[in-house]
Amino acid sequence: GVLDILKNAAKNILAHAAEQI
């Protein structure tokens, strides 16, 4: 569902941010 997509997007953003640190 839409919430799942948003959750996955949030995970991807957080994961990418973690790599930046």
UniProtKB/Swiss-Prot annotation:
Pfam families cross-referenced by the UniProt entry: Antimicrobial15 (PF08110)
Isoleucine amide found at: 21
Tissue: Expressed by the skin dorsal glands.
Places the protein is found: Secreted
Record keywords, A-Z: Amidation, Amphibian defense peptide, Antibiotic, Antimicrobial, Cytolysis, Hemolysis, Secreted
InterPro entries the record matches: Antimicrobial15 (IPR012518)
Signal peptide: none
One biological process term in Gene Ontology: defense response to bacterium
Chief place where the protein resides: secreted
Keyword Secreted: yes
Lineage top rank: taxon: Eukaryota
An annotated GO cellular component: extracellular region
Protein family according to the UniProt entry: Belongs to the frog skin active peptide (FSAP) family. Ocellatin subfamily.
Function noted in UniProt: Has hemolytic activity against human erythrocytes and antibacterial activity against the Gram-negative bacterium E.coli.
Name this polypeptide is given: Ocellatin-3
Source organism of the structure: Leptodactylus ocellatus (Argus frog)
